[in-house]
Protein backbone atom coordinates (compact mmCIF):
# COMPACT_ATOMS: atom_id res chain seq x y z
CA UNK A 1 0.00 0.00 0.00
CA UNK A 2 1.42 3.35 -1.11
CA UNK A 3 -0.07 6.83 -0.76
CA UNK A 4 0.54 9.83 -3.00
CA UNK A 5 -0.47 13.46 -2.82
CA UNK A 6 -2.28 14.22 -6.08
CA UNK A 7 -4.03 16.82 -8.19
CA UNK A 8 -4.43 20.44 -7.22
CA UNK A 9 -2.19 20.25 -4.17
CA UNK A 10 0.79 19.18 -6.30
CA UNK A 11 -0.05 21.73 -8.99
CA UNK A 12 -0.26 24.64 -6.56
CA UNK A 13 2.87 23.52 -4.71
CA UNK A 14 4.83 23.64 -7.97
CA UNK A 15 3.37 27.07 -8.75
CA UNK A 16 4.46 28.35 -5.35
CA UNK A 17 0.87 28.93 -4.29
CA UNK A 18 -0.71 28.11 -0.91
CA UNK A 19 -2.04 24.56 -0.82
CA UNK A 20 -5.59 24.69 0.55
CA UNK A 21 -6.90 21.15 0.20
CA UNK A 22 -4.82 18.00 0.03
CA UNK A 23 -6.16 14.92 -1.73
CA UNK A 24 -4.47 11.55 -1.65
CA UNK A 25 -4.61 8.45 -3.81
CA UNK A 26 -3.88 5.00 -2.43
CA UNK A 27 -2.27 2.33 -4.62
CA UNK A 28 -2.18 -1.36 -3.76
CA UNK A 29 -5.11 -1.36 -1.36
CA UNK A 30 -8.80 -2.14 -1.32
CA UNK A 31 -11.71 -1.08 0.87
CA UNK A 32 -11.02 -3.80 3.44
CA UNK A 33 -7.40 -2.62 3.77
CA UNK A 34 -8.52 0.96 4.41
CA UNK A 35 -11.16 -0.03 6.96
CA UNK A 36 -8.65 -2.21 8.81
CA UNK A 37 -6.39 0.82 9.24
CA UNK A 38 -9.15 2.95 10.72
CA UNK A 39 -10.15 4.96 7.65
CA UNK A 40 -13.80 6.05 7.51
CA UNK A 41 -15.69 5.52 4.22
CA UNK A 42 -17.40 8.67 2.91
CA UNK A 43 -17.63 8.26 -0.85
CA UNK A 44 -21.08 7.55 -2.21
CA UNK A 45 -20.01 7.12 -5.83
CA UNK A 46 -16.30 6.37 -5.44
CA UNK A 47 -14.18 4.55 -2.83
CA UNK A 48 -13.11 7.58 -0.77
CA UNK A 49 -12.07 7.46 2.88
CA UNK A 50 -11.23 9.95 5.63
CA UNK A 51 -7.90 9.60 7.42
CA UNK A 52 -8.53 8.71 11.09
CA UNK A 53 -6.33 11.60 12.34
CA UNK A 54 -6.02 14.29 9.65
CA UNK A 55 -9.52 13.74 8.20
CA UNK A 56 -8.08 14.36 4.73
CA UNK A 57 -9.57 12.43 1.82
CA UNK A 58 -7.87 9.28 0.57
CA UNK A 59 -9.24 7.67 -2.60
CA UNK A 60 -8.38 4.25 -3.93
CA UNK A 61 -6.65 4.39 -7.29
CA UNK A 62 -9.28 3.82 -9.95
CA UNK A 63 -10.02 3.75 -13.64
CA UNK A 64 -13.22 5.04 -15.22
CA UNK A 65 -15.31 4.06 -18.22
CA UNK A 66 -17.93 6.15 -20.01
CA UNK A 67 -21.38 4.55 -19.95
CA UNK A 68 -23.76 7.40 -20.93
CA UNK A 69 -23.85 11.08 -21.89
CA UNK A 70 -23.27 13.73 -19.27
CA UNK A 71 -20.98 14.12 -16.30
CA UNK A 72 -22.66 11.31 -14.31
CA UNK A 73 -22.48 8.62 -17.00
CA UNK A 74 -19.47 6.71 -15.66
CA UNK A 75 -18.61 3.37 -14.14
CA UNK A 76 -15.36 2.88 -12.23
CA UNK A 77 -12.96 0.13 -11.28
CA UNK A 78 -10.99 0.39 -8.03
CA UNK A 79 -8.74 -2.46 -6.99
CA UNK A 80 -5.23 -3.29 -5.82
CA UNK A 81 -4.12 -3.81 -9.42
CA UNK A 82 -4.84 -0.22 -10.53
CA UNK A 83 -1.56 1.66 -10.92
CA UNK A 84 -0.82 5.28 -10.07
CA UNK A 85 -0.33 6.13 -13.74
CA UNK A 86 -3.70 4.60 -14.61
CA UNK A 87 -5.34 6.74 -11.94
CA UNK A 88 -3.58 9.89 -13.15
CA UNK A 89 -4.54 9.14 -16.76
CA UNK A 90 -8.26 9.54 -16.01
CA UNK A 91 -7.73 13.15 -14.86
CA UNK A 92 -8.64 16.14 -16.99
CA UNK A 93 -5.52 18.26 -17.54
CA UNK A 94 -1.82 17.48 -17.40
CA UNK A 95 -1.28 20.10 -14.70
CA UNK A 96 -3.77 18.17 -12.54
CA UNK A 97 -2.32 14.74 -13.35
CA UNK A 98 0.78 14.81 -11.16
CA UNK A 99 1.53 13.10 -7.87
CA UNK A 100 4.08 13.45 -5.09
CA UNK A 101 5.37 10.52 -3.06
CA UNK A 102 6.34 10.43 0.62
CA UNK A 103 9.91 11.50 -0.24
CA UNK A 104 8.76 14.58 -2.13
CA UNK A 105 9.46 13.14 -5.57
CA UNK A 106 7.12 14.38 -8.32
CA UNK A 107 5.57 11.70 -10.52
CA UNK A 108 4.62 13.35 -13.79
CA UNK A 109 3.88 10.85 -16.57
CA UNK A 110 2.02 13.31 -18.82
CA UNK A 111 4.17 16.45 -18.86
CA UNK A 112 2.32 18.53 -16.31
CA UNK A 113 5.46 20.36 -15.15
CA UNK A 114 6.31 21.28 -18.72
CA UNK A 115 2.83 22.68 -19.30
CA UNK A 116 2.88 24.57 -15.99
CA UNK A 117 6.12 26.27 -17.02
CA UNK A 118 4.70 27.13 -20.44
CA UNK A 119 1.32 28.30 -19.12
CA UNK A 120 -0.60 25.70 -21.12
CA UNK A 121 -3.77 23.78 -20.27
CA UNK A 122 -3.64 20.46 -22.12
CA UNK A 123 -5.88 17.40 -21.81
CA UNK A 124 -4.30 14.20 -20.57
CA UNK A 125 -6.02 11.80 -22.94
CA UNK A 126 -9.00 11.51 -25.31
CA UNK A 127 -11.02 10.50 -22.22
CA UNK A 128 -11.25 14.24 -21.51
CA UNK A 129 -14.16 14.25 -23.97
CA UNK A 130 -16.16 11.88 -21.79
CA UNK A 131 -17.04 14.50 -19.17
CA UNK A 132 -18.60 17.80 -20.37
CA UNK A 133 -17.88 19.50 -17.03
CA UNK A 134 -14.25 19.50 -18.15
CA UNK A 135 -15.08 22.15 -20.73
CA UNK A 136 -16.05 24.48 -17.91
CA UNK A 137 -13.14 23.41 -15.72
CA UNK A 138 -10.58 24.09 -18.44
CA UNK A 139 -12.05 27.55 -19.01
CA UNK A 140 -12.07 28.18 -15.26
CA UNK A 141 -8.42 27.22 -14.89
CA UNK A 142 -7.62 29.61 -17.74
CA UNK A 143 -9.33 32.33 -15.69
CA UNK A 144 -7.44 31.37 -12.54
CA UNK A 145 -3.93 31.19 -13.91
CA UNK A 146 -4.16 33.22 -17.11
CA UNK A 147 -3.00 30.13 -19.04
CA UNK A 148 -3.81 29.40 -22.66
CA UNK A 149 -5.68 26.25 -23.62
CA UNK A 150 -3.71 24.07 -26.02
CA UNK A 151 -5.04 24.14 -29.58
CA UNK A 152 -5.61 20.39 -29.60
CA UNK A 153 -7.61 20.72 -26.37
CA UNK A 154 -9.72 23.57 -27.78
CA UNK A 155 -10.34 21.40 -30.84
CA UNK A 156 -11.48 18.53 -28.63
CA UNK A 157 -13.73 20.89 -26.64
CA UNK A 158 -15.30 22.08 -29.91
CA UNK A 159 -15.98 18.49 -30.91
CA UNK A 160 -17.61 17.85 -27.53
CA UNK A 161 -19.91 20.84 -28.03
CA UNK A 162 -20.75 19.76 -31.58
CA UNK A 163 -21.54 16.26 -30.30
CA UNK A 164 -24.04 17.68 -27.83
CA UNK A 165 -22.07 16.93 -24.67
CA UNK A 166 -22.54 20.51 -23.38
CA UNK A 167 -26.30 20.09 -23.74
CA UNK A 168 -26.15 17.29 -21.18
CA UNK A 169 -24.83 19.58 -18.45
CA UNK A 170 -27.30 20.15 -15.64
CA UNK A 171 -27.93 23.65 -14.31
CA UNK A 172 -26.34 23.00 -10.92
CA UNK A 173 -22.99 21.99 -12.41
CA UNK A 174 -22.97 24.86 -14.89
CA UNK A 175 -23.68 27.35 -12.11
CA UNK A 176 -21.11 25.78 -9.81
CA UNK A 177 -18.32 26.10 -12.37
CA UNK A 178 -19.46 29.50 -13.66
CA UNK A 179 -19.59 30.93 -10.15
CA UNK A 180 -16.08 29.67 -9.41
CA UNK A 181 -14.83 31.08 -12.70
CA UNK A 182 -16.41 34.48 -12.11
CA UNK A 183 -14.54 34.70 -8.81
CA UNK A 184 -11.16 33.96 -10.36
CA UNK A 185 -8.55 36.63 -10.98
CA UNK A 186 -9.25 36.84 -14.71
CA UNK A 187 -12.91 35.85 -15.28
CA UNK A 188 -12.88 37.44 -18.72
CA UNK A 189 -10.62 34.59 -19.80
CA UNK A 190 -13.23 32.00 -18.87
CA UNK A 191 -15.88 33.59 -21.05
CA UNK A 192 -13.40 33.97 -23.92
CA UNK A 193 -12.43 30.30 -23.76
CA UNK A 194 -16.06 29.16 -23.61
CA UNK A 195 -16.78 31.29 -26.66
CA UNK A 196 -13.75 29.99 -28.55
CA UNK A 197 -14.89 26.38 -28.21
CA UNK A 198 -18.55 27.14 -28.90
CA UNK A 199 -19.80 26.32 -25.42
CA UNK A 200 -20.87 29.89 -24.66
CA UNK A 201 -23.49 29.70 -27.41
CA UNK A 202 -24.95 26.62 -25.73
CA UNK A 203 -24.66 27.62 -22.07
CA UNK A 204 -25.09 31.41 -22.25
CA UNK A 205 -26.50 32.21 -25.70
CA UNK A 206 -27.70 35.60 -24.44
CA UNK A 207 -24.11 36.64 -23.71
CA UNK A 208 -22.76 35.05 -26.89
CA UNK A 209 -25.28 37.08 -28.93
CA UNK A 210 -23.64 40.34 -27.79
CA UNK A 211 -20.47 39.73 -29.80
CA UNK A 212 -20.54 41.59 -33.08
CA UNK A 213 -23.25 44.02 -31.94
CA UNK A 214 -21.87 47.57 -32.43
CA UNK A 215 -22.13 50.46 -29.97
CA UNK A 216 -21.58 54.19 -30.37
CA UNK A 217 -17.85 54.86 -30.48
CA UNK A 218 -18.17 58.07 -28.45
CA UNK A 219 -19.54 56.08 -25.51
CA UNK A 220 -17.79 52.81 -26.26
CA UNK A 221 -14.42 53.10 -28.03
CA UNK A 222 -14.22 49.29 -27.93
CA UNK A 223 -17.31 49.26 -30.23
CA UNK A 224 -18.31 45.60 -29.75
CA UNK A 225 -20.98 44.94 -27.10
CA UNK A 226 -19.48 41.56 -26.26
CA UNK A 227 -16.03 43.05 -25.73
CA UNK A 228 -17.57 45.71 -23.47
CA UNK A 229 -19.24 42.97 -21.43
CA UNK A 230 -15.90 41.20 -21.00
CA UNK A 231 -14.23 44.47 -19.99
CA UNK A 232 -16.98 45.26 -17.49
CA UNK A 233 -16.71 41.80 -15.96
CA UNK A 234 -12.94 42.08 -15.71
CA UNK A 235 -13.18 45.55 -14.18
CA UNK A 236 -15.58 44.15 -11.57
CA UNK A 237 -12.99 41.49 -10.76
CA UNK A 238 -10.17 44.03 -10.58
CA UNK A 239 -12.29 46.05 -8.14
CA UNK A 240 -12.62 42.97 -5.95
CA UNK A 241 -16.40 42.85 -6.28
CA UNK A 242 -18.54 39.98 -4.98
CA UNK A 243 -20.04 37.10 -6.96
CA UNK A 244 -23.49 38.77 -7.29
CA UNK A 245 -21.80 41.93 -8.55
CA UNK A 246 -19.65 40.08 -11.08
CA UNK A 247 -22.63 38.07 -12.28
CA UNK A 248 -24.62 41.29 -12.71
CA UNK A 249 -21.70 42.77 -14.67
CA UNK A 250 -21.77 39.79 -17.03
CA UNK A 251 -25.50 40.20 -17.74
CA UNK A 252 -26.00 43.97 -17.49
CA UNK A 253 -26.19 44.66 -21.24
CA UNK A 254 -28.09 41.63 -22.55
CA UNK A 255 -30.69 43.98 -24.00
CA UNK A 256 -28.22 45.20 -26.63
CA UNK A 257 -28.61 41.90 -28.48
CA UNK A 258 -32.32 42.77 -28.80
CA UNK A 259 -31.76 46.17 -30.42
CA UNK A 260 -33.43 46.50 -33.86
CA UNK A 261 -30.70 46.59 -36.54
CA UNK A 262 -32.07 49.80 -38.08
CA UNK A 263 -31.21 51.91 -35.00
CA UNK A 264 -27.71 50.52 -34.40
CA UNK A 265 -25.25 51.55 -33.05
CA UNK A 266 -27.69 53.27 -30.67
CA UNK A 267 -29.38 51.12 -28.07
CA UNK A 268 -32.44 52.97 -26.87
CA UNK A 269 -34.31 50.93 -24.28
CA UNK A 270 -31.70 48.21 -23.95
CA UNK A 271 -32.02 48.43 -20.16
CA UNK A 272 -35.70 47.51 -20.29
CA UNK A 273 -35.22 45.06 -23.18
CA UNK A 274 -32.59 43.19 -21.22
CA UNK A 275 -34.76 42.29 -18.25
CA UNK A 276 -36.45 39.30 -19.85
CA UNK A 277 -33.19 37.73 -21.12
CA UNK A 278 -31.68 38.19 -17.65
CA UNK A 279 -34.66 36.40 -16.13
CA UNK A 280 -34.28 33.58 -18.63
CA UNK A 281 -30.61 33.13 -17.73
CA UNK A 282 -31.42 33.23 -14.02
CA UNK A 283 -34.07 30.55 -14.42
CA UNK A 284 -31.98 28.33 -16.67
CA UNK A 285 -28.93 28.44 -14.39
CA UNK A 286 -31.04 28.40 -11.23
CA UNK A 287 -28.93 31.30 -10.03
CA UNK A 288 -29.06 32.00 -6.29
CA UNK A 289 -31.62 34.62 -5.36
CA UNK A 290 -29.08 37.29 -4.40
CA UNK A 291 -27.29 36.94 -7.74
CA UNK A 292 -30.51 36.80 -9.77
CA UNK A 293 -32.08 39.84 -8.13
CA UNK A 294 -28.99 42.02 -8.45
CA UNK A 295 -28.49 41.06 -12.10
CA UNK A 296 -32.06 42.05 -12.93
CA UNK A 297 -31.81 45.27 -10.91
CA UNK A 298 -28.59 46.38 -12.57
CA UNK A 299 -29.84 45.54 -16.05
CA UNK A 300 -33.07 47.49 -15.57
CA UNK A 301 -31.67 50.56 -13.83
CA UNK A 302 -28.03 51.06 -14.81
CA UNK A 303 -28.79 53.69 -17.46
CA UNK A 304 -30.94 55.67 -15.00
CA UNK A 305 -28.17 55.41 -12.41
CA UNK A 306 -25.69 56.80 -14.94
CA UNK A 307 -28.00 59.71 -15.82
CA UNK A 308 -28.77 60.92 -12.29
CA UNK A 309 -27.62 64.44 -13.13
CA UNK A 310 -30.45 64.76 -15.66
CA UNK A 311 -33.24 63.57 -13.38
CA UNK A 312 -35.93 65.53 -11.59
CA UNK A 313 -36.33 65.09 -7.85
CA UNK A 314 -39.62 63.23 -8.27
CA UNK A 315 -37.97 60.78 -10.67
CA UNK A 316 -35.16 60.19 -8.20
CA UNK A 317 -37.65 59.41 -5.45
CA UNK A 318 -39.49 57.03 -7.77
CA UNK A 319 -36.23 55.23 -8.58
CA UNK A 320 -35.31 54.89 -4.91
CA UNK A 321 -38.70 53.36 -4.24
CA UNK A 322 -38.79 51.06 -7.27
CA UNK A 323 -35.30 49.73 -6.57
CA UNK A 324 -36.29 49.12 -2.93
CA UNK A 325 -33.35 51.27 -1.83
CA UNK A 326 -35.04 52.33 1.42
CA UNK A 327 -35.44 48.76 2.62
CA UNK A 328 -32.37 47.27 0.96
CA UNK A 329 -29.66 49.95 0.91
CA UNK A 330 -26.82 47.41 0.78
CA UNK A 331 -28.14 45.91 -2.45
CA UNK A 332 -28.61 49.42 -3.87
CA UNK A 333 -24.97 50.15 -3.11
CA UNK A 334 -23.77 46.96 -4.80
CA UNK A 335 -25.76 47.87 -7.92
CA UNK A 336 -23.90 51.18 -8.02
CA UNK A 337 -20.61 49.32 -7.71
CA UNK A 338 -21.47 47.43 -10.90
CA UNK A 339 -22.23 50.76 -12.57
CA UNK A 340 -18.66 51.84 -11.84
CA UNK A 341 -17.41 48.67 -13.54
CA UNK A 342 -19.73 49.39 -16.48
CA UNK A 343 -18.40 52.93 -16.84
CA UNK A 344 -14.76 51.93 -16.52
CA UNK A 345 -15.05 48.71 -18.53
CA UNK A 346 -14.43 50.52 -21.78
CA UNK A 347 -11.36 51.05 -23.93
CA UNK A 348 -9.05 53.59 -22.26
CA UNK A 349 -11.71 54.49 -19.67
CA UNK A 350 -10.37 52.38 -16.80
CA UNK A 351 -9.97 55.36 -14.47
CA UNK A 352 -13.04 57.39 -15.41
CA UNK A 353 -14.54 58.96 -12.25
CA UNK A 354 -18.06 57.94 -11.30
CA UNK A 355 -19.49 60.68 -9.04
CA UNK A 356 -22.99 59.28 -9.59
CA UNK A 357 -22.42 56.59 -6.97
CA UNK A 358 -21.67 59.00 -4.15
CA UNK A 359 -24.55 61.23 -5.23
CA UNK A 360 -27.10 58.42 -5.27
CA UNK A 361 -26.01 57.36 -1.80
CA UNK A 362 -26.21 60.96 -0.61
CA UNK A 363 -29.71 61.25 -2.07
CA UNK A 364 -30.78 58.09 -0.28
CA UNK A 365 -29.31 59.33 2.99
CA UNK A 366 -31.05 62.68 2.57
CA UNK A 367 -34.40 61.06 1.83
CA UNK A 368 -34.01 58.94 4.94
CA UNK A 369 -33.82 62.13 7.01
CA UNK A 370 -37.57 62.43 6.60
CA UNK A 371 -39.05 61.01 9.81
CA UNK A 372 -41.57 58.60 8.33
CA UNK A 373 -42.58 57.27 11.74
CA UNK A 374 -43.39 60.73 13.03
CA UNK A 375 -45.27 61.62 9.85
CA UNK A 376 -47.34 58.45 10.07
CA UNK A 377 -48.20 59.10 13.71
CA UNK A 378 -49.28 62.67 12.97
CA UNK A 379 -51.47 61.59 10.06
CA UNK A 380 -53.16 58.95 12.17
CA UNK A 381 -53.73 61.42 15.00
CA UNK A 382 -55.46 63.73 12.51
CA UNK A 383 -57.55 60.90 11.12
CA UNK A 384 -55.72 61.12 7.80
CA UNK A 385 -54.02 57.74 7.64
CA UNK A 386 -54.74 57.54 3.93
CA UNK A 387 -52.35 60.50 3.42
CA UNK A 388 -49.36 58.84 5.11
CA UNK A 389 -47.58 57.70 1.92
CA UNK A 390 -48.16 61.04 0.21
CA UNK A 391 -46.83 63.02 3.18
CA UNK A 392 -43.75 60.83 3.49
CA UNK A 393 -43.05 61.37 -0.21
CA UNK A 394 -43.36 65.13 0.23
CA UNK A 395 -40.95 65.11 3.14
CA UNK A 396 -38.46 63.01 1.21
CA UNK A 397 -38.72 65.27 -1.82
CA UNK A 398 -38.02 68.27 0.39
CA UNK A 399 -34.75 66.60 1.40
CA UNK A 400 -33.82 65.46 -2.11
CA UNK A 401 -34.55 68.65 -4.05
CA UNK A 402 -31.78 70.97 -2.75
CA UNK A 403 -29.18 68.20 -3.01
CA UNK A 404 -30.15 67.43 -6.59
CA UNK A 405 -30.20 71.11 -7.52
CA UNK A 406 -26.67 71.54 -6.20
CA UNK A 407 -25.44 68.44 -8.06
CA UNK A 408 -26.97 69.53 -11.36
CA UNK A 409 -25.50 72.98 -10.97
CA UNK A 410 -22.02 71.73 -10.11
Curated annotation (Swiss-Prot):
Q: Which domain of life is it from?
A: Bacteria
This enzyme's EC code(s): 2.7.7.72, 3.1.3.-, 3.1.4.-
The record ties this protein, via Pfam families, to: HD, PolyA_pol, PolyA_pol_RNAbd
Which Gene Ontology BP terms does the record give?
A: RNA repair; tRNA 3'-terminal CCA addition
| Cross-referenced CDD domains | HDc, NT_ClassII-CCAase
Cite the domain annotation text.
Comprises two domains: an N-terminal domain containing the nucleotidyltransferase activity and a C-terminal HD domain associated with both phosphodiesterase and phosphatase activities.
Which family, according to UniProt? Belongs to the tRNA nucleotidyltransferase/poly(A) polymerase family. Bacterial CCA-adding enzyme type 1 subfamily.
Q: What is this protein called?
A: Multifunctional CCA protein
Amino acid sequence: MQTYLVGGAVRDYLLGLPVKDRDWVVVGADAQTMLAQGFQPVGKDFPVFLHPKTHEEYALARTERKTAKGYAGFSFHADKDVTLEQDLMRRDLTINAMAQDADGKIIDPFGGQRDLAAGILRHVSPAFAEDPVRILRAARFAARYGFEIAEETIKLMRQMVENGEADALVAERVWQELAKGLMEKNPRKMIEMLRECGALQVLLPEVDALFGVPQRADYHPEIDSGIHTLMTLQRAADMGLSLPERYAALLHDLGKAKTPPDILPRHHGHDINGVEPVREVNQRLRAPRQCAELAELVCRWHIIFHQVGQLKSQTILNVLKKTDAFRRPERFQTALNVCIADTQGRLNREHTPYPQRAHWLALLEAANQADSGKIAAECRAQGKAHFIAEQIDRARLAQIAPLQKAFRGA
